[in-house]
């Protein structure tokens, strides 16, 4: 279910993680459709943030749970 995936991602990204590691956690392929389905909405709602915000496509880019994301985890 979608909520379970969101919770899994936010817990997993308490420490910064690469996109490929997030996809591996979810058991999905490394494709832009999966980025748009799973990571992009969390970025747009400020639950995840970029570790290299000025270079979104950097090969060193990782994703980290924000304070807002951590607060969300506390409510469930």
Please provide the spans of the model-predicted regions.
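C-terminal regulatory or interaction extensions
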Residues: 1-76
């Amino acid at each position: 279910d979608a909520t379970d995936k969101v919770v899994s991602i936010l817990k997993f990204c308490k420490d910064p993680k690469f996109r490929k590691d997030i996809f591996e956690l979810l058991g999905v392929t490394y494709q832009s459709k999966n980025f748009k389905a799973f990571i992009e909405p969390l970025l747009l709602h400020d639950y995840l943030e970029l570790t290299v915000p000025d270079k979104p496509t950097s090969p060193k880019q990782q994703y980290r749970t924000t304070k807002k994301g951590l607060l969300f985890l506390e409510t469930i």
